[in-house]
């Protein structure tokens, strides 16, 4: 736990008592502050009370006593409309912050020079965060991993000079962290997302920009217009900007050429790493993730040799191009996290041909219409869930398909067909381009079911992260 000593002897209001909310409340109290916490869910309030946290209905509170108001990132700050607690805080002139801001203030208070790498972006941030954490940890350094990736940031160990923090930040967390000042900040990409909570794409981009704007080193992927504009703007303001690209050859910065990762400066181009044979980092999208990780780790003082070792041993993340197993020459890949066509595109682009594609579930707007350019790579599709009839119409005569209905049937049929393929490496790919809740509780349960079905096949050799 990180006790928030920066708030010692002050009184703090807190709203939102989910998992991270209770952790935040405990950290505030451990630092010597008084707290009044609340939630709209009576069960959450009861859990907080049983954990020894002082609770009280903030609608009845005297807001003049509060030094700050700590808001859960899941609670609306501005859109579609501010939560009632936000209105009360603003009316009383009380500053509204979140758990990441509390971490930043405590770091500034007790160990302002400890390395702090913060990562954001619409896509790829969890993989990049996990990769950076893995590289640093593999060197034997003291590394703390948390934030939006699943570990509440205030449950980590307290800041000290030689302790590295690797923190994934959502737009909601950034919006509640006005003092965010990482040693290295990463903005991978921007596409429309969470606009119901941010009002417009411009506002969403402006919030994401804050993470890199106050960074010691701003590492920005420039393959979309929003990030390109942010990089240009920050560079013009005198901030140290390092550009990365998975698509463009840069005159200055870091870019990918296939599996080669290159650095360009002053007319010189040097190869700094290769992803050849690293199955957990297959595909152009992972080349961008690796570029960001390399630059961040270099800025934090790691050597290229240390970084290379970490890249090669990275196991990948579950449900994100996760290599589950092999049977003979057939590779089985779990990309259950791909819940829309945009997320499935990188998976299909990662294999040149002979893909046995398991796809379907609850379809999103547009279905798989945007993926037609990848259809020549697909040997056969196996359609599951509610989307089966719709996707069958989209595939038409372009791709052989069967309606498998269930994931278990799809795995069995795809494994058999791929095993009869004469290609050097056929791949059975679960990349559903759909939500899961017609047949599964969430994408994790769907991915687990795929993994279990694959590993139950006779002759499958389990794997994770190998080429």
Curated annotation (Swiss-Prot):
PANTHER family: UDP-N-ACETYLMURAMOYLALANINE--D-GLUTAMATE LIGASE
GO molecular function annotations of the record: ATP binding; tetrahydrofolylpolyglutamate synthase activity; UDP-N-acetylmuramoylalanine-D-glutamate ligase activity
The keyword Nucleotide-binding appears for this protein: yes
GO cellular component: cytoplasm
Similarity comment: Belongs to the MurCDEF family.
Pathway, per record: Cell wall biogenesis; peptidoglycan biosynthesis
Protein name: UDP-N-acetylmuramoylalanine--D-glutamate ligase
Residues that hold ATP according to the record: 121-127
EC number: 6.3.2.9
Catalytic activity: UDP-N-acetyl-alpha-D-muramoyl-L-alanine + D-glutamate + ATP = UDP-N-acetyl-alpha-D-muramoyl-L-alanyl-D-glutamate + ADP + phosphate + H(+)
GO biological process, one term: cell division
Keyword terms, alphabetized: ATP-binding, Cell cycle, Cell division, Cell shape, Cell wall biogenesis/degradation, Cytoplasm, Ligase, Nucleotide-binding, Peptidoglycan synthesis
Signal peptide positions (record): none
Predominant location category: cytoplasm
InterPro entries linked to this entry: Folylpolyglutamate_synth_CS, Mur-like_cat_sf, Mur_ligase_C, Mur_ligase_C_dom_sf, Mur_ligase_cen, MurD, NAD(P)-bd_dom_sf
Location in the cell: Cytoplasm
Organism the protein comes from: Brucella suis biovar 1 (strain 1330)
Function: Cell wall formation. Catalyzes the addition of glutamate to the nucleotide precursor UDP-N-acetylmuramoyl-L-alanine (UMA).
Domain of life (superkingdom): Bacteria
Keyword field contains Transcription: no
HAMAP family tied to this protein: MurD (MF_00639)
